[in-house]
């Protein structure tokens, strides 16, 4: 791969384009009622990041984890603003995901493999935690798959009144729709690779939690997505400070570390 980062022409062009793009992004209003320790999330091997459950291989350092957390949070918030929920908590899932992907692309992430489909469940009921683990099983192997499973278990083992579980429920459920993502970040050849699966649930009945409860297969529509994206940390370093400035105090409202 050519060393684009050392090319001053590339750096200047990328900086100008990304600066304009980031400045123009609309984000939801800041909600100071929700607060968590962002530093705890960076120090943890797994975390809640808005509607995403993310875990990190042991060889990723704090800066790399921070880059993943900040960039994917900014992309989620921009998509939330572009595709808001209606009075039933529903929104344009494909539009949301396209906006999310667009933002990541403009921050230096490159998509390697993406898929989106209507997910079929065999049987009369299912739980979303088992479904998303089944989906991500096709992306991950060995230790990475164990990380994903441990992240789900860490969330499941939280007390019902734990503020982290409350944060996750608030971010992933809205009356008749739920949206979660589970992924693992690893380091390969100097790049950060993020493999993740997403699950989107639409139902005619209101619900307050998407994981660890039984849903009847007759009451919902279920969609799934997978993606593998990579980030060159040197490229991201060009926009790192601006992303942090754009997020400002929002980070503490959406991140929470998990013990695995």
Annotated model-derived regions:
Residues 103, 138, 242, 246:
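Residues that form generic nucleotide/phosphate-binding pockets
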Residues 1-84, 89-90, 97-98, 158-260:
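C-terminal assembly and membrane-engagement modules of membrane-active proteins
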Residues 117-169:
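Membrane-inserting effector segments that mediate pore formation, membrane fusion
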Residues 26, 108, 142-143:
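Short, flexible coil/linker elements and helix-boundary hinge sites characteristic
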Residues 104, 129-133, 232:
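Aromatic-residue detector
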Residues 111, 122, 191-194:
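A broad structural signal for short, well-ordered beta-strand segments within beta-sheet-rich domains
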